[in-house]
């Protein structure tokens, strides 16, 4: 549940969980990857996950360095949904 998510998960897990959920619901398959076209800002993601914009930026950059996602304005490409989900556990 969302409440359990807020209480028991750290900021990174909440952000990763949110990404996984939204990409699964609204993204489309492109080869082995999932692409989400969106209009969310880092601040929007921060508001939804009860974190700061700086934390969202840090986590997204870390996920990009780990080659789990690629993103630019308006697009998030998840390279491996299973590995992304494992990061949120």
Segments (PLM) and residue ranges:
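Charged/polar, solvent-exposed surface patches and flexible loops
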Residues: 5, 17, 86
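A small-molecule sensor/coupling module
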Residues: 1-14
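Phosphate-/nucleic-acid-contacting segments
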Residues: 24-89
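Short amphipathic alpha-helical elements of helix-turn-helix/winged-helix folds
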Residues: 18-22
């Amino acid at each position: 549940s969302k409440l359990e998510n807020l209480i028991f998960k750290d900021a990174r897990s909440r952000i990763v969980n949110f990404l996984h959920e939204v990409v699964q619901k609204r993204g489309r398959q492109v080869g082995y990857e999932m692409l989400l076209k969106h209009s969310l800002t880092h601040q929007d993601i921060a508001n939804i996950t009860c974190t700061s914009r700086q934390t969202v930026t840090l986590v997204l950059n870390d996920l990009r360095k780990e080659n789990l996602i690629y993103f630019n304005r308006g697009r998030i490409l998840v390279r491996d949904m299973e590995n992304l989900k494992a990061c949120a556990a």
